[in-house]
UniProtKB/Swiss-Prot annotation:
Co-factor binding details: Binds 1 [4Fe-4S] cluster per subunit.
Biological process per Gene Ontology, one example term: L-leucine biosynthetic process
Record protein name field: 3-isopropylmalate dehydratase large subunit
Entry's family note: Belongs to the aconitase/IPM isomerase family. LeuC type 1 subfamily.
Quaternary context: Heterodimer of LeuC and LeuD.
Residues at which [4Fe-4S] cluster binds: C353, C413, C416
Cofactor dependence: [4Fe-4S] cluster
Alphabetic keyword roster: 4Fe-4S, Amino-acid biosynthesis, Branched-chain amino acid biosynthesis, Iron, Iron-sulfur, Leucine biosynthesis, Lyase, Metal-binding
Entries under Pfam families matching the protein: Aconitase (PF00330)
Function: Catalyzes the isomerization between 2-isopropylmalate and 3-isopropylmalate, via the formation of 2-isopropylmaleate.
CDD domains per the UniProt record, alphabetical: IPMI
Gene from which this protein is expressed: leuC
Source organism, top-level taxon: Bacteria
Enzyme Commission (EC) number: 4.2.1.33
């Protein structure tokens, strides 16, 4: 159990509890890994390495695989058309069978985006270490876990040893105090954080999100915030566990039961940053000042409130940042001074490991219910897992989506990244609930604006970047953010 000789942050407590060997003379520590998540893109070479060395997977019981990045979101009962995608998925299936790793394949009720599947199964728990060959592994930090992405060589190392050599991360406390206004969500919080500290502001840090606004978030909201810690340059993001965490986990398939549950909760309640602990850096935000947010450029830090205009690079003092803004505006085909609300879109994507859970789908559906999408705008709604999809259909969300004129898809990473059939055409502009807006991220030449599910829904209705606030002004009968339950 954690020793309390010195005041520690949450991240430091979890690190100490997983220390196998303390590094000396500048060498890294050796850290034990409790949960290893695997998908089809970053695992083939790792399994090949095991095969060449004649090594087994050391802890197949702590390893779980799912198919997500390359999977189609329509016609999942048909052969995968793209050769590369099909090969990667077939390779994962062979590797999982050969090495005894549990795999959730297409058609399995538990298949889906790896960072949705882990929490919904109760595999992600407070105080554990989680790794995956995917940068958005930070999602799992919402439970008070130390969770971070690793490269393919590290995937092999964990498969072989269930450990990783690592140097301790720095810690940054991000405190968000106050109450969010109706229509403002967890996605707006993290976009505001990234806009404040920049895409490199968290480099080398574990970010711990704190304050009354964070505590008021659901687990889905906390996962959204922690998910995009990587877009701030951080290694991981964490939220200390509390009753909200415990309520989410209780009764899930892999959560402890009976006396084991009581013992687990007793330990989990110790996973709080000590009052006297000192962060290496701290950032503070006022939740009441955060508005619905949107990115205008080609990195997640290039964002503004939706009520603002496209910024002028001339107002940016730092030369590299100014040059990046100029290039971003050219790629995005935007002019300085243009109101963000006047920017038209060709597509809306509702999905990704950032915003594809049942709460996200409910929020989106509550805004579009009884309405029709804007003419000429393609709207794609992709649940994060087969189980989320089934739950949404039981609530009638699929019917709301289809009556709205949108596409209701099967689970997968989908249009978050240009690695499967769901892509933008060159020049198309998309309001997306995903996490990255780099050049070509959603397809070669595609232009991405990162938004919340509520902004995505309002944008799909109006055809231009919009929030529920805009719908409220247009129609007195339109559901407001309060009625949406956000």
């Amino acid at each position: 159990m954690t020793t309390e000789a010195l005041p520690l942050t949450l991240a430091e407590k979890v690190w100490q509890d997983h220390l196998v060997v303390k590094g000396e003379d500048g060498s890294p520590d050796l850290i034990y890994i409790d949960l290893h998540l695997v998908h089809e893109v970053t695992s083939p070479q790792a399994f090949d390495g095991l095969r060449v060395a004649g090594r087994p997977v050391r802890r197949p019981d702590l390893t779980i695989a799912t198919e997500d990045h390359n999977t189609p979101t329509i016609g999942i009962d048909k052969p995968i058309a793209d050769l590369t995608s099909r090969t990667q998925i077939e390779t994962l299936r062979r590797n999982a069978e050969e090495f005894g790793v549990r795999l959730h394949s297409l058609g399995d009720i538990e298949q889906g985006i790896v960072h949705v599947v882990g929490p919904q199964l109760g595999l992600t728990m407070p105080g554990i270490t989680v790794v995956c060959g995917d940068s958005h592994t930070s999602t799992h930090g919402a439970f008070g876990a130390m969770a971070f992405g690793i490269g393919t060589s590290e995937v092999e190392h964990v498969l072989a040893t269930q450990t990783l050599p690592l140097k301790p991360f720095k810690t940054m406390g991000i405190t968000v105090e106050g109450e969010l206004r109706p229509g403002v969500t967890a996605k707006d919080i993290i976009l505001a954080v990234i806009a404040k500290i920049g895409t490199g502001g968290g480099q080398g840090y574990v970010l711990e999100y704190r304050g009354s606004a964070i505590r008021a978030l659901s687990m889905e909201g906390r996962m959204t915030v922690c998910n995009m810690s990587i877009e701030a340059g951080a290694r991981a993001g964490m939220v200390a566990p509390d009753e909200t965490t415990f309520a989410y986990l209780k009764g899930r398939p892999h959560a402890p039961e009976g006396e084991d549950w009581d013992e687990a909760v007793a330990y989990w309640t110790t996973l709080q940053t000590d009052d006297a602990a000192v962060f290496d850096a701290e950032v503070f935000l006022d939740a009441g000042e955060i508005e619905p947010f949107v990115t205008w450029g080609t990195n997640p830090g290039q964002g503004v409130s939706l009520s603002q205009d496209v910024p002028d690079p001339a107002d940016i003092e730092e030369p590299n940042a100014r040059a990046a803004a100029e290039r971003a505006l050219e790629y995005m085909d935007l002019k300085s001074g243009t109101p963000m609300k006047s920017v038209p879109v060709d597509a809306v994507f509702m999905g990704s490991c950032t915003n594809s859970r049942i709460e996200d789908l409910r929020a989106f559906a509550s805004v579009i219910k009884g309405r029709k999408k804007a003419e000429g705008v393609r709207v794609m709604v992709v649940p994060g897992s087969a189980r989320v999809r089934l739950e949404a259909e039981a609530e009638g969300i699929d019917k709301i989506v289809e009556e709205f004129g949108a596409e209701w898809r099967f689970a997968g990473c989908s249009m978050c990244l240009g690695m499967n059939p769901d892509q933008l055409a060159p020049g198309e502009r998309c309001a997306s609930t995903s996490n990255r807006n780099f050049e070509g991220r959603q397809g070669k030449g595609g232009r991405t604006h990162l938004v919340s599910p509520l902004v995505a829904a309002a944008t799909a209705i109006r055809g231009t970047l919009s929030s529920p606030w805009d719908l409220e002004h247009e129609d007195a009968d339109t559901r407001t953010g309060e009625k949406v339950g956000i």
